[in-house]
Curated annotation (Swiss-Prot):
Annotated EC: 6.3.2.1
Other notes: The reaction proceeds by a bi uni uni bi ping pong mechanism.
An example molecular function term from Gene Ontology annotations: ATP binding
Subunit structure: Homodimer.
Family: Belongs to the pantothenate synthetase family.
Organism listed in the record: Clostridium acetobutylicum (strain ATCC 824 / DSM 792 / JCM 1419 / IAM 19013 / LMG 5710 / NBRC 13948 / NRRL B-527 / VKM B-1787 / 2291 / W)
Domain of life: Bacteria
Record's keyword annotation contains Acyltransferase: no
Residues binding beta-alanine, per UniProt: 61
GO biological process: pantothenate biosynthetic process
Protein name: Pantothenate synthetase
InterPro entries: Cyt_trans-like, Pantoate_ligase, Pantoate_ligase_C, Rossmann-like_a/b/a_fold
This protein's pathway: Cofactor biosynthesis; (R)-pantothenate biosynthesis; (R)-pantothenate from (R)-pantoate and beta-alanine: step 1/1
Active-site residues annotated for this sequence: 37 (proton donor)
């Protein structure tokens, strides 16, 4: 596996691979890779001849009071994960490589980004759409792999690919969880031991919602209320949002009549965690 830092070096490989008729899978990440990322890379390596993993903490998707400066980084560890999972290239650019100082062009999305995490993190999805578009242009992948834990991100990227006519298949991969149910996340490393135990309230509350749905509950108010009450049992937890939306459009629903996404964002101490599940009729 090669570790590359420049766009021009990546493009040299892409040009040769395309010349040879090889398929390319892209796994965009912000590094500090865990088993969730590993599962994306492994799937990409099974479905493509070559796999590029981008390892880039994208500054323009962070807000002014967010964790850009302290976001965990460990390139050596990431390289080991990528090598074992079958990646061909680990692309680790500096921000100055990805963005011109005087750049005036960005990729934005509307409506679908005005809810859930997008409503709480202004500008976040402009940063996501811009960096993903740039990565698509740099790597020319046949397929790109994203985790379902970031459900809104997956929906936004799928819509962007459709709207901008990218000839790329977006592959959404299942959430990978710890043994106690906590969704794998790089931000889990911020949690103290006490907070780590408390964080299981996210998956517990979602499991309760699944039980209600499995037992025939159709009223979204009742589902959300049950989640809120369950999370309220954990003293270290503070709800950011609890939402039930159409799984494709992400529009709010009041009654379960179609495939839905149940999504939550919860602060455990000062650490904001997200989780979700999709329930199909």
């Amino acid at each position: 596996m090669e570790i590359l830092h420049s766009i021009s070096d990546v493009k040299k490989y892409i040009k040769q691979w395309k010349k040879e008729g090889l398929t390319i899978g892209l796994v965009p990440t912000m590094g500090y890779l865990h088993d969730g990322h590993k599962s994306l890379i492994e799937r990409a390596s099974k479905e493509n001849d070559k796999v590029i993993v981008s390892d880039f903490v994208n500054p323009i998707q962070f807000g002014p009071n967010e964790d850009l400066d302290v976001y965990p980084r460990d390139l050596d560890r990431d390289a080991e994960v990528c090598t074992k999972a079958g990646a061909s290239i680990l692309f680790n650019p500096e921000p100055s490589e990805m963005y011109f100082d005087d750049a005036v062009t960005f990729v934005n999305s509307s409506k679908i980004t005005d809810i859930l995490c997008g409503a709480r993190r202004p500008g976040h999805f402009r940063g996501v759409c811009t960096v993903v578009t740039k990565l698509f242009n740099i790597t020319c992948p046949d397929r790109a792999y994203f985790g379902e834990k970031d459900a809104q991100q997956v929906a936004v990227i799928k819509r962007m690919v459709r709207d901008l006519n990218f000839d790329i298949e977006i592959v959404a991969c299942p959430i990978i969880r710890e043994e106690d149910g906590l969704a794998k996340s790089s931000r889990n490393s911020y949690l103290s031991s006490e907070e780590r135990k408390a964080a299981t309230i996210l998956s517990k509350s979602l499991n309760l919602a699944k039980e209600l749905l499995d037992n025939g509950e159709k009223n979204v108010y009742n589902i959300k209320k049950a989640i809120i009450i369950e999370i309220g049992k954990e003293p270290l937890a503070k709800i950011d949002y609890v939402e039930v939306v159409d799984s494709l459009s992400l529009k709010s629903v009041s009654k379960v009549q179609q495939s839905i996404l149940v999504a939550i964002a919860v602060y455990i101490g000062k650490i904001r965690l997200i989780d979700n599940f999709t329930w199909n009729i």
